[in-house]
Amino acid sequence: MAISHMQELSLLLPKDLLDDVLSYLQNLQSVEIQDLQAKETWQGAFEQELVWNPDKSFSEHLQTLTRRQEKLANMIERLQAFVPKKKLLESLKEVPLEITFVDLEQAGQARDEEALLVNIQQQFQALARAQEVKEMAQSEMAELEKWASLAVTPSALKHFKHLRAFVGTIPSSENNQLNARLRDYPNLEVREVFTSSTEKGILVLCKAEVAKETQAVLTELGFKLFEYAFEELPKERLVALQATIKEQEALITSTQAQLAASNEELQQLKLQLDYILNLTSRQESKEALASTQNLVALEGWMEQGQIEDLKTGLAQQFGGAVLLQIHELTEADRQRVPTKLKNNALIEPFELVTEMYSLPKYEDKDPTPVVSVFYFIFFGMMAADIGYGLLLFGGTTWALKTLHVKPSLAKNLRFFRILGIGVALWGVIYGSFFGFKLPFALIDTSTDVITILIISVVIGFVTVMTGLFLSGKKNIRMKDYAAAYNSGFAWMLILIGLALLAAGRLFPALAMVGFIGEWLATVNAVGIVLVSIISAKSLKGLGPALFNLYNISSYVGDLVSFTRLMALGLAGASIGSAFNLIVSLFPPFARFSIGIVLFLALHSINMFLSFLSGYVHGARLIFVEFFGKFYDGGGKAFKPLKPAEKYVRYKK
């Protein structure tokens, strides 16, 4: 059970070296910076304004960096929409951007960020303008096409002295009324330009002296004037608009091609964003520091084994300008220490289960090694199948060897790779290979159901016993001996006694074992009552003692919970066998054509459900039946100052 030994340290440095020291610590990725304003030892100095934040323009600088982040992130998002996307598998196989921290810092400082953004922004603006012009031309064409047969422009008609012309539309429903009204005005000439289901385009000519009366009549009929200010005919205007559209389409195509070929610019933006994210992290860390006119104080946590490397690195980088001091931890300090788990390659992936529940406190023990054993058994037993296990192991191994994934995903892949071994091993025990029965099965899932049930309960019994033992051990370490007995060792002995008693009742030859078990359970039940009364120094301890004994029902429930190991394992095996039976009913030709596809599809579903059940129910057994006996969690994760890895991977 490994939790890294942490050491508290403090650095005192000249103010002009602050940015360099923070950059060095960020590259080191080993120091978690403490907030000095939250520490009691520093609060008085801050209140009296003996010390203050080293950056008086902290908020302004942070806001500036945030705006730069937003600009870069927005530009990356917009540019990625044009750069050809690779398929998911190809993108995962692609080697990520790799660079050293120092090179990223130097490149970030030297890069003309504003010019890079302006250059790309200009292309987007050109594209937007071209699309806008094209859309306006298309809209005008759609309105103008119906007037293509108009042989004279409205502006030309305005030059007549003795005639007045009206060009526009009326609703189609008003056509009959128009004809009727025209009879009252024999000097009017009406020409139809176009007709649609909703409106009719007309050209109306009249003498100048009756223009007002004509306009009034047309208005009553819903006449709408055709707004056209060009000297060229509509059909000529349509030709010009078509040319404009083609021109803008060519411009759009060329601009989109330029944006699609901007992969180098996209990489530069990604590198710059990670650089700005690093600057932001360092800027945010300044809020946790204390400063005078010339000096800055920094306190933090670091793994004990890395202290010497820090001393050497600071001396090489800054000479004697930075003072490093190591503090011995007191009992009060241990409550503040962050937790960093440290396990070997086989155990480390199972830290995911522990972290999902809660990290242990620094003064506690890491339960991950024990969790790894039980979770390995639980998951394997609930998904037991050789084929499923080999696929899980092979698939995760291939992904780890072939794909370039982030460290967090790689840890998950290693986790499931180990679980794949457990699934295959239990598949050997059950003799199951993709639902087919193998001749060397140690336990037959169709006939040995009671045996599997007993194994499940025994595994549950061992799990509960382990939890109770760890509970007793934890309380002894805390010097709470009464709790160690009442909540741990006494219940271990009671449950062992009850198990022996049950064995004696079931097997007459073990009658003496049953007698011993009966006394073992009775003596420890009485012991819980006596220890509770003695520790309370009065009969008030009797109530908690009786309530504690009443919890025997919860232990029965815990053991019953472990029957899911049998139930889910048998369910997966039965469903897989049923799928095989369905495929076997097909005629030979169908069996080896569509039957293969159906076999793969059905077993994929069953495999997914088996793994999902194993993952969820395995975690449930750990969290409730195991952790519920001894583990509180509540630890604070160790969070060192680290560089951002949104797009880049750092070379050592």
What residue spans do the PLM features occupy?
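Long, charged N-terminal accessory/stalk domains
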Residues: 1-371, 406-409, 413
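Conserved, carboxylate-rich catalytic/transport cores that coordinate ions
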Residues: 2-7, 14-30, 308-652
